[in-house]
Amino acid sequence: RDLDTRWPPPRRYHADVIRNLKNAGATLIVYDVLFSGPTTPEDDIALDKALKEAVNVVLTSRIDRNFTQLSKSLEEPHYDDELGIDFLAAARVGFAEVPTDADQIVRRFVPTMKFRDEWIPSLASAAFLAFTGKEETDIQVERDHIVVGGQTIPRTGPTVIDLVDKAPVPSAYMDFPAGNGTFPMTSFGQVALDEFSKVQFN
């Protein structure tokens, strides 16, 4: 049985997913969905409440580039002071930007990018920092490696230059020989409806 709705589903379903994963024993919930901007007050309040109750969620942001004005902006999870909504009040955040090669295959990742002269974490780095109890600012970029929360990542991938602010974008190749089906999968609808095996989440 699945949800009778199209993607993106109303945010109340995301609230159910977060709450059910938390109740199932998930140590960390990494949510690769950008919750920017408002939807309905009821749905936004429901998601805000679930995030604040869970306190173990990492959300997604996006770096937007204006190539005409040569400026960057950070599209972050939603907040509304009048309604008391702040999705980041009890959650972490990391940018979702995954480089692909010419054949559209993902072989490397970007652990961090520079935004307004500060190194900010990718979604994967933010998840690692949250899991290990480190601060989001615990990132150092050196000539041949990156240190994220005390973990050294060799800069084995190419370093490209951001066309907007000319900042270096370091990358590292991933050692992941496995394919689809390596990890067990559960549908969004099953988790939202609380019809899933809890064993794989604790």
Each PLM stretch: what is its role?
Residues 1-157, 198-202:
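Non-transmembrane functional regions of envelope-associated proteins
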Residues 104, 156-160, 164-170, 176-202:
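Extracytoplasmic
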